[in-house]
Amino acid sequence: MKEPLIFDLSRPGRKGYSLSPCDVPEVPLESIIPASLLRKEAVELPEVAENEVVRHFVRLSNLNYHVDKNMYPLGSCTMKYNPKVNDYTCDLSGFSALHPLQPTSTTQGALQLMYELSNMLAEIAGMAGVSLQPAAGAHGELTGILLIKKYHEVRGDKRHKLLVVDSAHGTNPASAALAGYETISVKSNGDGRTDLEDLRSKLDGDVAALMLTNPNTIGLFEKEIVQIAEMVHANGSLLYMDGANMNALLGITRPGDMGFDVMHYNLHKTFAAPHGGGGPGSGPVGVNEKLLPYLPAPLVVKEGDTYRLTSGGDDSIGRMMNFYGNFAVLVRAYTYIRMLGAEGLRRVSENAIINANYLLSKLLERYELPYPKPVMHEFCLSGDKQKKAHGVKTLDIAKRLLDYGFHAPTIYFPLIVSEALMIEPTETESKETLDIFADALLAIAREAEENPDVVKMAPSTTAVKRLDEATASRQLTICCM
């Protein structure tokens, strides 16, 4: 049943509150607030009893989909189960009751956590130093690009181009543009990896860096990464890694060892902080020795048994946000790493890779794989066969999956795959869950052949049915007051 808006539940005179009688003299508002600031009409607030308000929001919460309810297969999002011990440590009063402006003598535990987390992240990725300030992945990207820009500026090298592989996240060129760079696209080859000849043809004296994701967005490891790093560095450019897919690399290999100069982590993804509702995120940036002087300040340093914040050197790019990053996410990531240890982190990536390849092997029965396997932690199928043969688009398949009780995967991304259906099962899903999910997608493929209208009209069991997306894209009014 469709849940009405809270305003539709409103009835004149109903109240969900009880206030004590006013114990001060009442005065006309006009006598204390300028008339120009007063409303001309009464504010339109819903009048609803307390029990109806509670029931309304409980019903809405039951409609919500989240990783505690079922598998969340969004590709390139790493929607893994978030251990509840992370929330327990985050709620400890020694962390939750702190204020960032307290004297550092009273926040030694928090500073120790930040110091140790920075060191652990640096070790995991093979970097020389880490800043915890960036608030999300794209914010980390921007920070990394500004570090690259500072590196070249200090050398008097006025480079104005950034190379971005065509399978990259959309935030890569957006972050580059925000930092003032011209973005040049590098093609993928027939195997879905970086085309070295196209890269070579675009490397010139104006190129500040190449932005790369490894594994890339279709789940393939860039096997020629060492050669790519050599080509980029020989050009005087730097190599940036988007850490969106670090869940495939933990304990197996390190970006710093591959030749990357700078990267960002997504703590909310790889290190298990809830982000299905939009955040908060955390996108720390790791750098090698050549970029250390430019890291955002403040950083935490240890002197004897005491921790303190530094103001950064003369070449630091300065603050990237107020205070010290999204601290609650840092606590969760620290807990996750300490709970698992080095061996546990490696098992995370191994199991993520196993799950992705197992699920892929089942789905190849009816879906096309545009690039060769094996894959790493995720894969990208194509719905071209269903579209050409039966008029069923990837969008239809994704909508129909809702009727089977699953959140849809990422669709129509990356752009190099036609009718893309990108799936990342993560390491936390069992074989039984993967089997049920695979059976659902295979059933939808059969429906596309035998009764395509069922798929085209989906979803049919959700509270909100298929939206008129064409009208929504043309009429952009989203709120009526």
Curated annotation (Swiss-Prot):
Source organism (scientific name): Chlorobium chlorochromatii (strain CaD3)
Catalysis: reaction(s): N(6)-[(R)-lipoyl]-L-lysyl-[glycine-cleavage complex H protein] + glycine + H(+) = N(6)-[(R)-S(8)-aminomethyldihydrolipoyl]-L-lysyl-[glycine-cleavage complex H protein] + CO2
Enzyme class: oxidoreductase
Matches recorded under Gene3D superfamilies: 6.20.440.10, Aspartate Aminotransferase, domain 1, Type I PLP-dependent aspartate aminotransferase-like (Major domain)
Cofactor(s) listed: pyridoxal 5'-phosphate
HAMAP family: GcvPB
An example Gene Ontology biological process: glycine decarboxylation via glycine cleavage system
Superkingdom of this protein's organism: Bacteria
Subunit organization: The glycine cleavage system is composed of four proteins: P, T, L and H. In this organism, the P 'protein' is a heterodimer of two subunits.
GO molecular-function terms, A-Z: glycine binding; glycine dehydrogenase (decarboxylating) activity; pyridoxal phosphate binding
Oxidoreductase found in the keyword field: yes
GO CC terms: cytosol; glycine cleavage complex
Family matches, as Pfam families: Aminotran_5, GcvP2_C
CDD domains xref list: GDC-P
EC annotation from Swiss-Prot or TrEMBL: 1.4.4.2
Modified sites of kind N6-(pyridoxal phosphate)lysine: 269
Keyword Lipoprotein (UniProt): no
Entry similarity comment: Belongs to the GcvP family. C-terminal subunit subfamily.
Listed name of the protein: Probable glycine dehydrogenase (decarboxylating) subunit 2
Gene name for this UniProt entry: gcvPB
Keywords: Oxidoreductase, Pyridoxal phosphate
Function: The glycine cleavage system catalyzes the degradation of glycine. The P protein binds the alpha-amino group of glycine through its pyridoxal phosphate cofactor; CO(2) is released and the remaining methylamine moiety is then transferred to the lipoamide cofactor of the H protein.
